[in-house]
Amino acid sequence: ANTNWNLVSSPVIGQDIDTFVAIEDLSSVSGSNIGLRDYNNSVASWEYYENGVSVAGDFISGDGRGIQLADPGDISFSGSINTSDVTIGMTSNTNGFNLVGNPYPSYVAGNEKADGTNNILSINAANLIENTLWFWNQETNSYLPINQSSSAFHIAPAQGFFVNALGSENLNITEAMQSHQETDSFLRLTSRREIQLTLTNGSDTRNADIYYIEGATTGWDNGYDSSIFGGI
């Protein structure tokens, strides 16, 4: 990882949080805050871990966190491989956004082009306000939305992302979603006709991708249209 913020999730079971903090070269953010943070959707903001403050317990499978290293390097997790389906409890609170992640040391299918049946969006459609996954894109300094109109998207091991919960529902990530891939998590695997509109103010960039899909409407098609991430 570089020294930018990354969204991650433990790909193993049993990684102690205090041990992780002691071993990893986490950045100093401000005051006693360090480069490890949780997202709290009750107040729509980040909550930071503090230097020297012990946190009991392990990382929970499927929970996402923000991590920033002091220097570029690898992020390591130690534990046992998850060999069962993972159920992640979500809350709606202020805005419904939940930071979750891939709980396996293998890629998982994000949308139906990655796997027609066993993918996160299809399996969890009834539990999400918007059938979209949001990933932090360091190149554009913005969140990249992935939906059913996106190209085949396989979520990398330890990758964190946001979803928007309908209520106190569960997000289900199953063993059947796993696959072996040799590409990174942001590589588009297919090509097709599309229009991309780009807006920039000199520091931030926003893209709007327009696809031609048979059967789509000129209105809002949940699962095929996505809004800009509004969690922060």
Regions found by a protein language model. Name each.
Residues 2-15, 19-22, 30-232:
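Compositionally biased Ser/Thr/Gly- and acidic/asparagine-rich
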